[in-house]
């Protein structure tokens, strides 16, 4: 599923991406700590107004660590691309972040762009 998130300018997009990167990094560190314990955890899933609880061993959650790594890499690539192409310039206008299955894929900027 594809989703577009709109931002008022590039700086607000960068701020959002950095916050997401920070949250993912903290989650990854915590998950790595838990994976080393070989413990049992409860996973709470909210779907279609229903709550599901599943109990799994932490060793079965390595796929989640891979998913987090994929998201961290995608965000890092977008941030690096924005730094490389725009430098420190903040463009205003229509700034869209495209997510594909929850993973940031690309940034779309409106034309013509104005300096903010």
Summary of predicted features, one role per range:
Residues 58-105:
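Coiled-coil termination/hinge junctions
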Residues 11, 108-116:
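Short, surface-exposed, low-complexity cationic segments
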Residues 1-34:
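Short, charge/polar-rich alpha-helical segments
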Residues 25-28, 32-35, 39-42, 46, ...:
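Coiled-coil heptad-register positions
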Residues 22, 44, 51:
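Metal/cofactor-centered catalytic core regions of large enzymes
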Residues 7, 99, 109-111:
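Surface-exposed beta-strand edges and flanking loops
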Residues 3, 10, 17, 47-50, ...:
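Amphipathic alpha-helical coiled-coil segments and their boundaries
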């Amino acid at each position: 599923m594809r989703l577009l998130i709109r931002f008022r300018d590039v700086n607000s997009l960068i701020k959002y991406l950095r916050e997401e990167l920070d949250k993912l990094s903290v989650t990854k560190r915590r998950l790595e700590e838990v994976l080393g314990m070989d413990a049992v955890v409860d996973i709470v899933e909210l779907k279609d107004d229903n709550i599901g609880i599943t109990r799994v061993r932490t060793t079965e959650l390595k796929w989640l660590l891979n998913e987090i790594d994929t998201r961290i890499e995608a965000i890092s690539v977008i941030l690096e691309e924005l730094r490389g192409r725009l430098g420190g310039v903040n463009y205003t206008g229509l700034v869209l972040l495209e997510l594909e299955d929850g993973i940031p894929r690309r940034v779309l900027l409106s034309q013509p762009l104005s300096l903010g």
